[in-house]
From Swiss-Prot:
One of its GO terms (biological process) is DNA-templated transcription. Pfam families: RNA_pol_Rpb2_1 (PF04563), RNA_pol_Rpb2_2 (PF04561), RNA_pol_Rpb2_3 (PF04565), RNA_pol_Rpb2_45 (PF10385), RNA_pol_Rpb2_6 (PF00562), RNA_pol_Rpb2_7 (PF04560). This is DNA-directed RNA polymerase subunit beta. InterPro entries: DNA-dir_RNA_pol_bsu_ext_1_sf, DNA-dir_RNA_pol_bsu_external_1, DNA-dir_RNA_pol_su2, DNA-dir_RNAP_su2_dom, DNA-dir_RNAP_su2_hyb_sf, RNA_pol_bsu_bac, RNA_pol_bsu_CS, RNA_pol_bsu_protrusion. Signal peptide: none annotated. It catalyses: RNA(n) + a ribonucleoside 5'-triphosphate = RNA(n+1) + diphosphate. The keyword Nucleotidyltransferase applies.
């Protein structure tokens, strides 16, 4: 068995020197997790967290009526079961959705207005149907109206507080204007700015600005409160005519003394008059216990009062808080006999912005402030303090109207240094005060502002959150309707379901999935395109950016993207940088920030413990790269290590390193990490390479790359296109359409599921019309493990991603046919169907009930000969397997015609041939131009209640037959497994009671249980089984009960599915029958097809050469493709050359293995395979010098020596397995490598040049990787050796057959009468201005006249031309082009009298 397990899995020769510390996470886990968190479907109601749909219900409900006498309260929600399976939804054009039921409580109150008491009168609780929600499939997609759609996650600015400045561009003075913005998820935006006059202004919702202190006063703060929050105070005391201030060393630094400052103990002058206070002097005075120091009046003139100064007798305000001190005020204070007052302390580095703002602000009271703000935001509405107070409370402090979100609160706490609870999701007054304080401090210190492109300030809204927002919009719409119903009708007589109408909610959700910019038609070209589409992040969409307004900075790569967003994969064109991809190891945390994993390092030792950090958690921590040199215990070997600190690269001492990357391919996306030798390619070409892999068409026979990167298997498994075993088990039955596996996970079948039947999809059409087909890769009797691929999907082979083919490529010019990226291809590739792909087109026809009568699907079509009907069955539907070409009938349909006046001849024909022929027209579904293929499927959907035709019944019978087979197999396997299990458990026990089959005794009492005893006895008959050991009897009964439940479930499933077929279908109104026909087309590689490698090396097939003419090797093998060597140097994608060399070695080793298999030299083959796969790579730490210290394959070598040097457990296990295989198993394993040994050269940790050379030599080839080729035309060798090897080439979805198009006659535009444009409209080729010039330049006057008149928009000329051709008079008579008439009419409509003057010369 060990052998067959190894044989079912492809082993690659690994070149990576870094062992994988952490597995690549589930590639579409982000989508699934987000949706699961939104629904919390499998969480009991009482345990649900406040997220997703639960939070939406909690935040919108309870809904109270306008009088407060009743309220509708939320209790819980639950889900029903899906009505149709995913397969049915796709074929019937339905949405895969799940019904939602919500339990609500209607509470009616008695209100005693006089006593002000409210008591509950009545409570009614009810579960209500609340519409449906589309359900995510296992593959992370949604099926909406029969098509698979993916919801792209949005990357948007997170909520919270942000500080920025205008870089001095706004004001003419060039002064930098600092701004702060508080962004909530829901509610009003607050903008603060400091203008050039140092006044702090605020805007709410981008309205007119006003001083921020008005808002503070509206919050209830006085001038003194505001000043004490922003500034320190200094107490001034007047003694004996001299002013003194308290001695505070912090406030005196860098100040000068107004008088001699004396030591209180010795009396000597410590600081002389006019001198600076030094740190030493301040310390001396502090030690001496000095309490106050003398100051002059000049020291405080120009400073501000901290509190208002009031006359002690008259209570007249002599100076307001914040007003400036001048000699007059000081005189007034002295006259009033006031000896103490406090002033503001503003140091030389700070501004008094807030004092200036207070001076500008003319508002004196809270009521005045409230009314002032209300007038600014609601001009025209009458303002009272109460209304204004309520308005401001709603604006910032009510959860229903303002939501900062937990992310916003987290960011605000982080930025303002607060520790407010994360559940406080509204603003607090302190938040606005602190924001203003931080803004002033930033401006004063010229501090660093926030970088809005940093990933700490951008977060991901995944599908769950997007849906949550839509659901809330729907519920708020519904809330208004509920309030109106509560007030209009008598609540006592109502039940909750009378109030709740779920339609607005369902409509919003449906609109989101159908029309939102973020809900996209899924790219299903191949598994990689599916996976990357689900991992895509878009900055566009509602609440995001627009293409036109997005600047360069937003699109650019940022240091915080490292390990989170791929710097390579992004579309070319207007969306560049706005649509990006998640990195391989990245994940999105609960707050929506992207995290990447790191290994924890401490004191120079890197552990295997992993932590995930978001961009702002990473901040200033030194992080070593994945290629940092470690010893076996994880100690960093170099004293100085290259690391990243705050986005910059620095050399850091090893003991200071805190984290280390987990893998070299951590910083690129899935698509980019599939490119071998990515590190040797220019970034622009790498971008093209990763984008073009997504366009590769699945071929008839897929082939995994010989030179891969090692993650092909992960992509194939996670993409969901391959069938993966759900449990450990043994394959019981396999055919092309299904795999039956007996589960062995939990003992022998005692698990809840004893058998799993996997159904394979055959020639199913994908969204991009490529062919989705499963091919089982296991055999009957194979053991399979959970998570193992058991059937390949499109573009997968042996459970690995296989987008293209390994072909022999030569780099050389060939007769100019590979000029400018053209590709020369061998005829062998066409003959053997190497690049042949199957494309499936779906056509549908609808029979409707029209005003004139019912349309009919029939074989009886007027004016159609027997030849046209030969492939239609009696129901008028084409048979499966029929070959069709353009114009052929797929489904015969006739439509009633309106009554017309008949000529006498027609009346006679009617009289002879009956009524039928005349009153119907042929509206059959015919094959459109450009489609030629084989009919692979026909689906018929009939309206419920109408009789079914023969074809429909035949299709249903076949489907029910399949279901019966599945049910019978499942019951049989469960029965056999349970019988065996019972025989094992009860072995040697004597039966205490007889076992009967009906009334007949099958096993008498006292019989000892042996293997095979229960064979042929049903589980129901075994239910009364008893043995001496009561515990064993009990165990046997538990097993039998479980089995009975499984069998019952299998039968129920069959009955449910079978009954669905018998019921008929739900079709749109007026539709009687819907028929869908699938036609599969073979697309053979042809001239004009676009092909590409994985390094951005794209080109178009220019010529398909006969094999005899192609360059060939000495042994007669020809090359498959010839590429232009000039395509490499200027593009700087050298990775393709390294790939070709390594591919050359891989194919050479494969040929050696093939020869040894042919010669049956098993021992030599064993040694060679062990040598290939276990030759030690450079030990970790020698990577930097890899080129100098490589191991030579051809040197004296034994596996034992290798094992001593390498401690890789997998490798030891591999050698052990190979040694224990018998010859048959081993040859089966070895034959996997006949066509080449598969290599894995991971991104940024790949094979070194020296390793490739050594491998080429070991394969018996020239280490230069070049060979002498001979010209197929002459037989002469070419002048110089040529680089030739194996390259992985893809056929892209830009196929010439889909683009080529010809027109003779066709539709014309209504106004201009010119032919339409484009293939879809069956249009013509535009002859534009430049083409006219070209014709003129060649003097082709008559041809040109024909082009722009009779072949275009000369209507009379067109008909004349037709008549002339019919009569054989080929004379051109052009008339007036219609577009000229349109032009003259246009000018006449503008009031210009313009006419064409005709005259003869």
């Amino acid at each position: 068995m060990t052998g067959s397990l190894l044989a079912s899995k492809r082993i690659r020769k690994e070149f990576g020197s870094k062992s994988r510390v952490v597995d690549i996470p589930d590639l579409i886990g982000m989508q699934r997790t987000s949706f699961e968190r939104f629904l919390q479907r499998n969480v009991p109601p009482e345990e649900r967290e406040d997220i997703g749909i639960h939070l939406v219900f909690k935040s919108v409900l309870p809904i109270k009526d306008f009088t407060g006498t009743s309220s509708l309260e939320y209790v819980s929600y639950s889900f029903g079961e899906t009505k149709h399976s995913m397969k049915e939804c796709i074929s019937r054009g339905m949405t895969y959705e799940i019904p939602v039921n919500i339990t609500v409580r209607l509470v009616v109150y008695d209100v005693d207005k006089d006593a002000g008491v409210t008591s509950i009168r009545d409570i009614k609780e009810q579960e209500i149907y609340f519409g449906t929600i589309p359900l995510m499939t296992k593959r992370g997609t949604f099926i909406i109206n029969g098509t698979e759609r993916a919801v792209v996650s949005q990357l948007h600015r997170s909520s919270g507080v942000f500080f920025d400045h205008d870089k001095g561009k706004s004001h003419s003075s060039g002064k930098i204007i600092y701004t702060a913005r508080i962004i909530p998820v829901r509610g009003s935006w607050i903008d603060m700015e400091i203008d050039p006059k140092d006044i702090v202004n605020i805007r709410i919702d981008r309205r007119r600005k006003f001083p921020v202190t008005i808002l503070f006063k509206a919050f209830g703060y006085t001038n003194e409160d505001i000043l004490s929050f922003f500034y320190k105070k200094e107490q001034i005391v007047k003694k004996d005519g001299i002013l003194f201030k308290e001695f505070n060393p912090d406030n005196l630094k860098r100040n000068r003394a107004s008088f001699d400052i004396l030591d209180p103990e010795t009396g000597e002058a410590v600081v002389k008059k006019g001198r600076l206070f030094t740190l030493r002097a301040l310390k001396q005075l502090q030690v001496a216990g000095l309490k106050s120091i003398p100051i002059s009046e000049e020291d405080i003139i120009g400073r501000g009062f901290a509190t208002s100064v009031v006359h002690p007798e008259t209570e007249e305000i002599l100076a307001k808080a914040g007003s400036l001190i001048d000699p007059e005020v000081l005189e007034k204070i002295a006259d009033a006999g006031i000896t103490e007052f406090s002033i503001l302390y503003v140091d030389t580095y700070s501004s008094d912005s807030m004092r200036k703002t207070l001076a500008v602000d003319k508002v004196t009271s809270r009521a005045e402030a409230l009314i002032e703000i209300y007038r600014r935001l609601r001009p025209g509405n009458p303002a009272t303090p109460e209304v204004a107070q309520d308005f401001i409370d709603h604006l910032f402090f009510k959860p229903a109207y303002y939501d900062l979100s937990n992310v916003g609160r987290l960011k605000m706490n982080h930025r303002l240094g607060m520790s407010t609870g994360i559940d406080v999701r509204t603003l607090r007054r302190e938040d606005i005060l602190l924001t203003a304080a931080t803004l002033v401090e930033l401006k004063d210190t010229q501090g660093a502002v926030d970088d809005i492109d940093h990933l700490g300030n951008r977060r991901v809204r995944a599908v769950g959150e997007l849906l949550e927002n839509q659901y809330r919009i729907g519920l708020v719409r519904m809330e208004r309707a509920i309030k109106e119903r509560m007030s209009m009708q008598e609540v006592d007589a109502m039940m909750p379901h009378d109030l709740v109408n779920p339609k607005p909610v369902s409509a919003v959700v449906r609109e989101f999935f159908g029309t939102s910019q973020l809900s996209q038609f899924m790219d299903q070209t191949n598994p990689l395109s599916e996976t990357t589409h689900k991992r895509r992040l878009s900055a566009l969409g509602p609440g995001g950016l627009t293409r036109e307004r997005a600047g360069f900075e937003v699109r650019d790569v940022h240091p915080s993207h490292y390990g989170r967003i791929c710097p390579i994969e992004t579309p070319e064109g207007p969306n560049i940088g706005l649509i990006v991809s998640l990195c391989t190891y990245a994940r999105v945390n609960d707050f929506g920030f992207i995290e990447t994993p790191y290994r924890i390092a401490k004191d120079g030792v890197v552990s295997k413990q992993i932590t995930h950090l978001s961009a702002f958690e990473e901040k200033e921590h030194p992080i070593a790269q994945a290629n940092a040199v470690l010893d076996d215990q994880g100690h960093l070997m170099n004293d100085l290590v290259t690391s990243r600190v705050g986005g910059e690269f620095e050399m850091v001492a090893k003991n200071d390193i805190e984290f280390m990357d987990v893998s070299p391919n951590q910083l690129v996306s899935v698509s980019a990490s599939l490119i071998p030798f990515l590190e040797n390619d220019d970034a622009n070409r790498a971008l093209m390479g990763s984008n073009m892999q997504r366009q590769a068409v699945p071929l008839i026979r897929s082939e995994a790359p010989l030179v891969g990167t090692g993650i092909e298997g992960v992509v194939a498994r996670d993409s969901g296109v391959a069938i993966v075993a759900e449990h450990d088990g043994i394959v019981v039955d396999v055919d092309a359409k299904r795999i039956v596996v007996k589960n062995t996970e939990n003992g022998k079948g005692s698990d809840d599921r004893t058998v799993t039947i996997y159904t394979a999809s055959k020639f199913v059409r994908s969204n991009q019309n490529t062919c989705f087909n499963h091919r089982p890769i296991v055999k009957k009797g194979d053991a399979v493990r959970k998570g193992e691929v058991i059937a390949d999907g499109p573009s997968t082979e042996m459970g690995e991603l296989a987008l293209g083919k390994n072909v022999t490529v030569a780099f050389m010019p060939w007769g100019g046919y590979n000029y400018e990226d053209s590709i020369l291809v061998s005829e062998r590739l066409v003959k053997e169907g190497v690049y042949t792909s199957v494309h499936v087109e779906e056509f549908e026809v609808v029979a409707r009930d029209t005003k004139l009568g019912k349309e009919e699907i029939t074989r009886d079509i007027p004016n159609a000969g027997e030849e046209a009907l030969k492939d239609l069955d009696d129901s008028g539907i084409i048979r499966l397997g029929a070959e069709v070409k353009p114009g052929d009938i797929l489904v015969g349909k006739i439509t009633p015609k309106g009554e017309t006046q008949l000529s006498p001849e027609e009346k006679l024909l009617r009289a002879i041939f009956g009524e039928k022929a005349g009153d119907v027209k042929d509206t059959s579904l015919r094959v459109p131009p450009g489609v030629e293929g084989v009919v692979t499927a026909a689906k018929v959907f009939s309206r419920r209640g109408l009789p079914k035709d023969d074809r429909t019944r035949l299709i249903e019978d076949l489907e029910i037959e399949k279901l019966e087979k599945d049910r019978d197999d499942e019951v049989r396997i469960i029965t056999e497994t349970i019988q065996e299990r019972l025989e094992d458990i009860l072995a040697g026990q004597a039966l205490q009671a007889v076992v009967k089959k009906g009334k007949k005794v099958v096993v008498p009492a006292g019989t000892l249980v042996t293997r095979g005893l229960f064979e042929g006895i049903s589980l129901t008959d075994l239910m009364g089984l008893t043995v001496e050991d009561s515990s064993l009897t009990e165990m046997a009964h538990v097993i039998l009960e479980k089995a009975e439940t499984q069998i019952k479930k299998a039968r129920e499933n069959f009955n449910n599915q079978a009954s669905r077929y018998e019921k008929g279908d739900d079709l749109p109104p007026g539709v009687l029958k819907l028929i869908k026909i699938n036609v599969a087309m073979k697309r053979v590689l042809s001239v004009g097809d676009k092909m590409a490698g994985r390094h951005g090396n794209k080109g178009v097939v220019s010529r398909i050469l006969p094999v005899a003419d192609l360059p060939y090797f000495e042994d007669g093998r020809t090359v498959d493709m010839v590429l232009n060597p000039l395509g490499v140097p200027s593009r700087m994608n050298v990775g393709q050359i390294l790939e070709i060399h390594l591919g050359c070695a891989a194919r050479g080793l494969g040929r050696q293995i093939d020869d040894l298999i042919y010669e049956k030299k098993t021992d030599e083959l064993r040694a060679r395979i062990k040598r290939i796969f276990t030759t030690p790579l450079i030990k970790t730490g020698e990577r930097a010098n890899k080129d100098k210290t490589h191991y030579d394959f051809s040197s004296h070598y034994t596996v034992e020596k290798s094992m001593a040097k390498r401690t890789n457990e997998e490798e030891i296990q591999f050698v052990d397995t190979i040694d224990h295989m018998d010859d048959t198993e081993f040859l089966e394993f070895a034959s996997m490598y006949k066509n080449g040994v598969h290599m894995a050269t991971p991104v940024f940790d790949g094979a070194a040049e020296s390793e490739i050379k050594s491998l080429i030599s070991y394969a018996g080839l020239d280490p230069s990787g070049q060979s002498t080729l001979y010209d197929g035309r002459t037989g002469e060798p070419f002048d110089k050796p040529i680089t030739v090897g194996i390259m992985y080439m893809l056929k892209l979805h830009h196929l010439v057959d889909d683009k080529i198009h010809a027109r003779s006659i066709g539709p014309y535009s209504l106004v201009t009468q010119q032919p339409l444009g484009g293939k879809a409209q069956f249009g013509g080729q535009r002859l534009g201005e430049m083409e006219v010039w070209a014709m003129e330049a060649y003097g082709a006057a008559h041809a040109l006249q024909e082009f722009i008149t009779v072949k275009s928009d000369d209507m009379t000329g067109r008909t004349r031309m037709y008549e002339k051709i019919v009569k054989g008079q080929n004379v051109l008579e052009p008339g007036m082009p219609e577009s000229f008439r349109v032009l003259t009419k246009e000018l006449q409509s503008l009031g210009l009298d313009i006419n064409l003057l005709e005259g003869k010369k």
